[in-house]
Amino acid sequence: MPELRSRTSTHGRTMAGARALWRATGMTDDDFGKPIVAIANSFTQFVPGHVHLKDLGGLVADAVAEAGGVGREFNTIAVDDGIAMGHGGMLYSLPSRELIADAVEYMVNAHCADALVCISNCDKITPGMLLAALRLNIPTVFVSGGPMEAGKTVAIEGIVHSKIDLIDAMIAASNEAVTDDQLDQIERSACPTCGSCSGMFTANSMNCLTEAIGLALPGNGSTLATHAARRSLFVDAGRTVVEIAKRWYDGDDATVLPRAVANRAAFENAVALDVAMGGSTNTILHLLAAAREAELDFGVADIDTISRRVPCLAKVAPNSPLYHMEDVHRAGGIPAILGELDRAGLLNREVHAVHSPSLATWLADWDVRGDAATPEAVDLFHAAPGGVRTVEPFSTTNRWSTLDTDAAGGCVRDRAHAYTADGGLAILHGNLAPDGCVVKTAGVPEECLTFRGPARVYESQDDAVAAILAKEVTAGDVVVIRYEGPRGGPGMQEMLYPTSFLKGRGLGRACALLTDGRFSGGTSGLSIGHVSPEAAAGGLIALVEPGDEIVIDIPNRTIELAVPADVLDARRVAQEKRDRPYTPADRQRPVSAALRAYASMATSASDGAYRRVPE
């Protein structure tokens, strides 16, 4: 029988000093011997997805106490990718994932906590906590802050948009046809409430995936931050973590541990969900890194295989202007998408979750498109936006009058009515990316699925943005942004501004963008990222010259630089004769010691850009 980890500091004569300190936090004699649950909060006033989390750790702690445990809260950092976007702040976003993972590990292990609740929400916080949970492998439950409501009606260039988001504001900012007054209206409407940005961007994608992988409760990925129904997720997370902690420590039931829940079959299901819902390309980085922490042999080849057989069942912003997360919720949330995949025979059924003994039980109870969903599930998915600007959680009780169960033309479709027969994410290979690169096919216009054009080469995101705004990029071009990978950036910046500004200039369907950096979950269009190997590691992208023809064929999963091999060989010889080969020729970019430390240990995007620490 495993012993409570916390006994190390709560039992025995020599731990009198530690117990004295525990007592100073409010613990009593009755608490020693109960499971101590670490509550990793990520409240910050910098991030709308986290601004409302301040008191929610206490809500979890109260539920932990009621269930027979002792909750102790701490905080991690949280970077807002949208605020950090388009300047040097974005260099810190991906590296913050590793810092968050380390911070959770440090706090949990330093204080010998027995179990963990992760209160996450935005882009790198959920992945960072997921890495930590799989690394620690103690009973863990995730509960996120929830999605933001979509921005409401505005007119852009004479067209009324019933729902808008952050990306609409970014695109409008570079559109000369949008007046300052119109832009101000869009800006003020785009982000109306607390919560993670309202589309199927990185934050919401990852929160949906923690639900699919079995470490979060049903409804976690889609229940709005502002809705009163979300309160029960925090209470239930506190109760559930104590239940599974007791099953492990009192019953030696290892099936409740994160690595048993998030096993290979669960990862495959998570990827199936990801490609079915057209999730952010960043999810691939994070799932690869998480699989490594779980000690699973799971790589881009596995993701590629799944993406070829799983259809795209949902197109949510930025892949469609019609739907946001509030619409996914009305359609039954993640259980509805999983239910459609299960009925199509596309899920591994031999999985379980922290809340259910089997996938069959899980979906029977929570899939509102099935015939046995519980009243609790039906009630939850009626939760609707409040339509009021607020930073307060649980502040609306609005309800949809009906659910969207239209599998033929609704927000979530069945296999027979899928948007495409293969998934919303794809892995491409070729001489430009022998280790692979990633494209969100759900956001690519059909006429752009095959594309060829001359390269316009930039050695920083800043130079590319300047060129786009100066109208130097024209229809038919392939914009190549290199030396922005994990090592070359360092930090693997997101390229949301270049893609948004291309759209704002009317080039969203006329150009391709290729980078060894990455893209925001808000990106759509022919945007290909994670080119591996990256330029700084000697990848072929470092040898591309202006005017070179690049050929992209998404249906056949290929990407090629159409330059003769002998010419490329000569370019490589010249590159390696430089004083500092595989570095930008003229870029001036301050790089701090913290970023240099990340760069020195960062692996390729094809490995998840995790930090490889020497033995």
From Swiss-Prot:
Pathway: Amino-acid biosynthesis; L-isoleucine biosynthesis; L-isoleucine from 2-oxobutanoate: step 3/4; Amino-acid biosynthesis; L-valine biosynthesis; L-valine from pyruvate: step 3/4. Its cofactor is [2Fe-2S] cluster; Mg(2+). Keywords: 2Fe-2S, Amino-acid biosynthesis, Branched-chain amino acid biosynthesis, Iron, Iron-sulfur, Lyase, Magnesium, Metal-binding. Pfam families: ILV_EDD_C, ILVD_EDD_N. The modification N6-carboxylysine is found at K124. It catalyses: (2R)-2,3-dihydroxy-3-methylbutanoate = 3-methyl-2-oxobutanoate + H2O; (2R,3R)-2,3-dihydroxy-3-methylpentanoate = (S)-3-methyl-2-oxopentanoate + H2O. It is an enzyme of class 4 (lyase). The active site is at S520. Mg(2+) binds at D81, D123, K124, E494. GO terms for biological process: isoleucine biosynthetic process; L-valine biosynthetic process. Binds 1 [2Fe-2S] cluster per subunit. This cluster acts as a Lewis acid cofactor. SUPFAM superfamilies: IlvD/EDD N-terminal domain-like, LeuD/IlvD-like. GO terms for molecular function: 2 iron, 2 sulfur cluster binding; dihydroxy-acid dehydratase activity; magnesium ion binding. InterPro entries: Dihydro-acid_dehy_C, DihydroxyA_deHydtase, DiOHA_6PGluconate_deHydtase_CS, ILV_EDD_C, ILV_EDD_N, IlvD/EDD_N. PROSITE patterns: ILVD_EDD_1, ILVD_EDD_2. GO terms for cellular component: cytosol. [2Fe-2S] cluster binds at C122, C197. Its EC number is 4.2.1.9. Functions in the biosynthesis of branched-chain amino acids. Catalyzes the dehydration of (2R,3R)-2,3-dihydroxy-3-methylpentanoate (2,3-dihydroxy-3-methylvalerate) into 2-oxo-3-methylpentanoate (2-oxo-3-methylvalerate) and of (2R)-2,3-dihydroxy-3-methylbutanoate (2,3-dihydroxyisovalerate) into 2-oxo-3-methylbutanoate (2-oxoisovalerate), the penultimate precursor to L-isoleucine and L-valine, respectively. Homodimer. Belongs to the IlvD/Edd family. This is Dihydroxy-acid dehydratase. The gene is ilvD.
